[in-house]
Amino acid sequence: MSKDIPPASDFLAILTERGFLHQCSDPAGLDEKAKSGGLIAYIGFDCTAPSLHVGSLVQIMMLRWLQKTGGKPIVLMGGGTTRVGDPSGKDESRKILTLEEIEANKQGIKQVFSKFVHFGEGKTDALMADNAEWLTALHYIDFLRDVGRHFSVNRMLSMDSVKLRLERDQELSFLEFNYMCCQAYDFVELHKRYGCQLQMGGSDQWGNIVTGIDLGRRMGTAQLYALTSPLLTTASGAKMGKTAKGAVWLDEAMLPVFDYWQFWRNCEDRDVGRFLKLFTELPLDEIARLEALQDAEINEAKKILATEATAMVHGREAAERAADTARQTFEEGVVAASLPSVILQTNEIPAEGLGILAAFAKAGLVNSTSEARRQIKGGGLRLNDQPITDEKAVITIEAIEAGAKLSLGRKKHVLLRLADG
């Protein structure tokens, strides 16, 4: 399959048209495998945080498209590899997590996937596995003899994840050095257990994935394939999935639905078309129409992107509520009940009212009262859409009971509420 010949399989055609495809070890062979049906592919997710964030969405969407085009997705939880730590893209060693932390993170991450793929026992139903099941059962000497002998240290030292650390005189532990061996073994084990033929991942995983293909060949498995997606950045070059306030989590408990909706609504104009292709299932002709909008009209495309992307993660009803909240807040100027809220107890509020500096700090809109003072001097803080000019102002308990909307700039809002009873 050359660049001039479109893929014959629905799976690779969709990945190509929508911008998911970066590298593939054997495009023609994989295309034929996908076209014939029954393609089984996996992506691994280490348990380094309590949930996944937007930076993982490209990989999750690839699993979703695989299932929608007749393939079987495997979600591999890295219960074992998380204990080792992936050095890819890292300047220093990852923090070593306890087994309890890894297990807690794994449970949080698991919840994300049922929103994107269907799990079950059917031919195309998704499967979830955990590499701790086989990695923790390995005997060290046996692993060295049976598996380790197939790895070339010369080649391992040439991998970007290793080479960059060494060139910068940054420490790379023996533990991390073994990560690619574990990931390669995962691929072979998943092929042996489930007939998995393809490993997908971000472009930073190319070396590790290809190492798995090579290990499989040396250990006598059938043909295996690698496919990676491009490193996702915004049009201005910022890393996807992070904002000034932190990660854009896919878990409502870690990031309110409204904030998630706002993240997509606030994307750059140049990113709208690309994000619609990657993070929604809108038809390409509709995306082309939205992408062509100019000036103020592009904001309508951003609202559609925000609602569709939010519906994918949090459901259609929650996405529509977030869109309605934004409309009321920004276009109608009313206090929307579904804004992110901070609930205060009556005993937290002095008799004379809550100081404005403390209120913004409690709301999490500023990190300190001194930052609140600076924002007031710059005209950046508002109470119920009115600019705050007096740093000694207070919000009465009655105002909080009615719902006091605090705003930082034009796009960050929190509603202060009084606890019931």
From Swiss-Prot:
GO-annotated molecular function: ATP binding; RNA binding; tyrosine-tRNA ligase activity
Domain of life: Bacteria
Chain location of the short sequence motif 'HIGH' region per the record: 47-56
A single Gene Ontology CC term: cytosol
Residue positions of motif 'KMSKS' region: 239-243
Subunit-structure text: Homodimer.
Protein name stated in the entry: Tyrosine--tRNA ligase
Species of origin: Beijerinckia indica subsp. indica (strain ATCC 9039 / DSM 1715 / NCIMB 8712)
